[in-house]
Amino acid sequence: MASSSLCHRYFNKITVTPFFNTKKLHHYSPRRISLRVNRRSFSISATMSSSTKKVLIPVAHGTEPFEAVVMIDVLRRGGADVTVASVENQVGVDACHGIKMVADTLLSDITDSVFDLIMLPGGLPGGETLKNCKPLEKMVKKQDTDGRLNAAICCAPALAFGTWGLLEGKKATCYPVFMEKLAACATAVESRVEIDGKIVTSRGPGTTMEFSVTLVEQLLGKEKAVEVSGPLVMRPNPGDEYTITELNQVSWSFEGTPQILVPIADGSEEMEAVAIIDVLKRAKANVVVAALGNSLEVVASRKVKLVADVLLDEAEKNSYDLIVLPGGLGGAEAFASSEKLVNMLKKQAESNKPYGAICASPALVFEPHGLLKGKKATAFPAMCSKLTDQSHIEHRVLVDGNLITSRGPGTSLEFALAIVEKFYGREKGLQLSKATLV
């Protein structure tokens, strides 16, 4: 078995060796992107099929939303035809941490369909529900028998794949607390991503992007994986302690529980939105997800359907300790054109209360409305030219007094952890970083 990064390898049938210089990635990202992936006994055809690859991602009540959304988003960025299927009796799913999603279809309606890849997210009780879903078990076993790809993350390798007998004689990884269970049915390893034959496994929320890009590579080839990974602004050293850059330090105060508003709109970046909501809810903040427009259901940038708690019209009636915007081009443009939201943000800034944004939103929302005046900020690399002050754009997470900004999907967990740190302290941020495997 050989360890290597996505950015520095090529494959033959058994071994893995470097395939190109990482400097070529600078077209996509100013930082080298690294995936810590272990692989054994697999092959990739020298010529990838040009036909669209079909991917199934089953979800259930209690599915880990960040894992599911990243998998969907990244595989769709790669050009795969991704079907999100609910194993419940309805397409609406109440994922972990109170995050609501809407699947594309019911699994019961597509059990005869054939997929190039089936990917299982984790989360509890969602992982148990997937394990107990007989139609899904049958599909995954047939997938294995037919020599097609199966993948699972978090608790799913141990709960589902292990229980179904797919891991006998295989190396696999999973969420740390399930390692003992995994060891009873596989050779358990602590890799962030593990490939053994046609089985790919990974550990948890913080490894999901690496896991997903690895599967883009398995399914669509290394060139497509590099193309997809660059704009994600992935961590250069995944697993290392997260860091933030802070200027003009001030305390972020709150009474009782932090009240946090997360607006979303059609075209919002789903990975960023869910990362912010997921991590802040883990920290026990009171997070209000508010939809712009007339519907609680929002279709995000990669067609993930998210359901807000309230409409912005309702959310406007309350005050917040923080207003924080996800990115996504369509979502940021909607935010910028919402007089109601812009007025809320201006009032927040004038009151010296925290506000923040990631990806396109600092450049498309904050900059044109004067919300970055006298402040240092960062944004999505391709949007940084729109910032008047570009002196600190290289930072992944930047805090300037009551303002916090960040770069893109691959910085979204760090961004959310930085918010936790500002409200609750460094120890709480590190605790959640460890729990999410950032």
Swiss-Prot record:
Keywords, ordered alphabetically: Chloroplast, Plastid, Repeat, Stress response, Transit peptide
Transit peptide: 1-45
Single GO cellular component term: chloroplast
Record-linked CDD domains: GATase1_DJ-1 (cd03135)
UniProt cross-references to InterPro entries, sorted A to Z: Class_I_gatase-like, DJ-1, DJ-1/PfpI, Prot/Nucl_acid_deglycase
Residues annotated as domain PfpI endopeptidase: 53-220, 258-424
Compartment list: Plastid, Chloroplast
SUPFAM superfamilies in UniProt: Class I glutamine amidotransferase-like
Pfam families reported in the protein's UniProt record: DJ-1_PfpI
Major localization listed first in the record, in broad terms: plastid
Entry annotated with the keyword Chloroplast: yes
Residues annotated as transmembrane: none
Keyword Transit peptide: yes
GO MF annotations, alphabetized: glyoxalase III activity
Function: May be involved in oxidative stress response.
Subunit structure and binding partners: Homodimer.
Family from the record: Belongs to the peptidase C56 family.
Name used for this protein in its record: Protein DJ-1 homolog B
Organism: Arabidopsis thaliana (Mouse-ear cress)
Gene symbol of the encoding locus: DJ1B
